[in-house]
UniProtKB/Swiss-Prot annotation:
Protein family (similarity comment): Belongs to the BAR homeobox family.
A GO CC annotation given for this chain: nucleus
Pfam families xref list: Homeodomain (PF00046)
Start-end of DNA-binding region: 142-201
Organism: Homo sapiens
The protein, known as: Homeobox protein BarH-like 1
Gene (UniProt): BARX1
SMART domains named among the record's database cross-references: HOX
CDD domains assigned: homeodomain (cd00086)
Swiss-Prot/TrEMBL keywords: DNA-binding, Homeobox, Nucleus, Transcription, Transcription regulation
GO terms of biological process kind: anterior/posterior pattern specification; cell-cell signaling; digestive system development; endothelial cell differentiation; negative regulation of Wnt signaling pathway; regulation of transcription by RNA polymerase II; spleen development; Wnt signaling pathway
UniProt function note: Transcription factor, which is involved in craniofacial development, in odontogenesis and in stomach organogenesis. May have a role in the differentiation of molars from incisors. Plays a role in suppressing endodermal Wnt activity. Binds to a regulatory module of the NCAM promoter.
Amino acid sequence: MQRPGEPGAARFGPPEGCADHRPHRYRSFMIEEILTEPPGPKGAAPAAAAAAAGELLKFGVQALLAARPFHSHLAVLKAEQAAVFKFPLAPLGCSGLSSALLAAGPGLPGAAGAPHLPLELQLRGKLEAAGPGEPGTKAKKGRRSRTVFTELQLMGLEKRFEKQKYLSTPDRIDLAESLGLSQLQVKTWYQNRRMKWKKIVLQGGGLESPTKPKGRPKKNSIPTSEQLTEQERAKDAEKPAEVPGEPSDRSRED
């Protein structure tokens, strides 16, 4: 039987080159000694620590919190500033700015691999690119076409206007239905016709307008049929009456 000390005896210990996995023996039961890591083999600790630190810095919170070198920060800032100042600030109507933004701005048409631009320049480019015909813009309201009345409709309106300068709602409805027009068309025509009538009255020697400032008729501004007949009788009475025995002007001339 061979003893462990003899040359041919079998060795049950760890092979050479392998780490010793024997449990660490504590000298005391102090908390500081328990929490401290056991000392590793000489020379392997610095390399393992550096490798572990490198792996931790690739991913996770450590990578975000790790401080980057100052020179790399400075290089990135200089590159961004150079990319920004390639495009000068100009008003929105400048065509050169719109072409530059469309060629190099990300998010704009034709921007492939170009450096990013500030938000202000991107918004300016999009505002310039938007044309007036796009759905985002509001279209102007077109003017209403002017109503073309027929001769029969004009005759009916004029005939009614001679009798009645102002129409009530029932009268307007009846007139519109009889002439084949809408109430709005009749109302508009009456308003324009009254304005023309007021100008004619003022130009004919009238000192005051036949209507009030708000458009309401004044009292006795529109003569009635009875007043018209009385005026005709007064004009006939002013003419000189012919004497039966005297010859007329025509007979004297003969």
